[in-house]
């Protein structure tokens, strides 16, 4: 078993123990997104490699300010967070995250190992707490457990979504904004559902094309722009905009400030 200290070196990341378990992925089939926050490059490199074995995408932040910025950008499915960081500590990062996001499962991975440290971490909003040194196998197993219990990953077709005053009911296929019904075509509905499943996250045209159209229009990302324009006319007309262009990337849906 591979055991890691704060700045460990390991011959190999986890392989045999978890290698036979089924892969976990997002409801739309895309990879799990992990935000890993730690200021020790040796540790983040090895953990990132281990999570890549799971088929997950890993974004790394080395300080608190970077973590806060990347959280909104990445929209992670799980957050792995050190407490002792050079600027904003992990407890404060989680406090800020929980102000707007109460669902993303979070695991503290830290050298602070007293009982009081654990209690403080868990009562601050974390879902799990591991201390250094640690095993990569156990870390991966704990993250898999958090993800299995995370309701936003197993989204049924009849799910109900809400972002600000915008609601979408998958069962009745009804959409409202501020209580006003909005009529959408089937494609518009699926596009809006994908945007609402990823609020505050910059989504590329290619990713949207892949998830909504399944490459039926391969290479024609202009179809995304066309349907975004349709949605804007229906969702944002005479209201504060929720669908925003992210220059150089694509689009983001976020509630009015």
Curated annotation (Swiss-Prot):
GO terms for molecular function: phosphorelay response regulator activity; transcription cis-regulatory region binding. One of its GO terms (cellular component) is cytosol. Residues 33-147 form the Response regulatory domain. Phosphorylated by TrcS. Member of the two-component regulatory system TrcS/TrcR. Activates its own expression by binding specifically to the AT-rich sequence of the trcR promoter region. Also negatively regulates the expression of Rv1057 by binding to an AT-rich sequences within the Rv1057 upstream sequence. The TrcR-TrcS regulatory system may act as a transition regulatory system involved in adapting to an intracellular environment and transitioning from latency to reactivation. It comes from the Bacteria. GO terms for biological process: regulation of DNA-templated transcription. It comes from Mycobacterium tuberculosis (strain ATCC 25618 / H37Rv). Gene3D superfamilies: 3.40.50.2300, 6.10.250.690, Winged helix-like DNA-binding domain superfamily/Winged helix DNA-binding domain. The gene is trcR. Residues 158-255 bind DNA. PROSITE patterns: OMPR_PHOB, RESPONSE_REGULATORY. This is Transcriptional regulatory protein TrcR. SMART domains: REC, Trans_reg_C. Pfam families: Response_reg, Trans_reg_C. Keywords: Activator, DNA-binding, Phosphoprotein, Repressor, Transcription, Transcription regulation, Two-component regulatory system. SUPFAM superfamilies: C-terminal effector domain of the bipartite response regulators, CheY-like. The modification 4-aspartylphosphate is found at residue 82. Disulfide bonds: none annotated. Induction: Expressed in broth-grown cultures and after 18 hours of M.tuberculosis growth in cultured human primary macrophages, but not after longer periods of macrophage infection. Positively autoregulated.
């Amino acid at each position: 078993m591979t055991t890691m200290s704060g700045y460990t070196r390991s011959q190999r990341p986890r392989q045999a123990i978890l290698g036979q378990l089924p892969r976990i992925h997002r409801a739309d089939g895309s990879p799990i997104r992990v935000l890993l926050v730690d200021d020790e490059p040796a540790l983040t490199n090895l953990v990132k490699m281990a999570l890549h074995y799971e088929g997950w995408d890993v974004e790394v932040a080395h300080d608190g300010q970077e973590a806060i910025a990347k959280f909104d950008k990445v929209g992670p499915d799980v957050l792995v967070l050190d407490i002792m960081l050079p600027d904003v500590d992990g407890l404060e990062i989680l406090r800020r995250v929980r102000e707007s996001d109460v669902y993303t499962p979070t695991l503290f991975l830290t050298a602070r190992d007293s009982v009081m440290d654990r209690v403080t971490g868990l009562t601050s909003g974390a879902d799990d707490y591991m201390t250094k040194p640690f095993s990569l196998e156990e870390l991966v197993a704990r993250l898999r457990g958090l993800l299995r219990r995370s309701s936003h990953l197993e989204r049924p077709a009849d799910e109900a979504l809400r972002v600000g005053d915008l609601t979408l009911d998958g069962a009745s296929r009804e959409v409202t904004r501020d209580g006003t019904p909005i009529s959408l075509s089937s494609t518009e509905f699926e596009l809006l559902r994908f945007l609402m499943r990823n609020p505050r996250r910059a989504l590329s045209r290619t990713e949207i094309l892949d998830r909504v159209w399944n490459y039926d229009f391969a290479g024609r990302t202009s179809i995304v722009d066309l349907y975004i324009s349709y949605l804007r006319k229906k969702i944002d007309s005479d209201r504060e905009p929720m669908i925003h262009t992210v220059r150089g990337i694509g689009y983001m849906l976020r509630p009015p400030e």
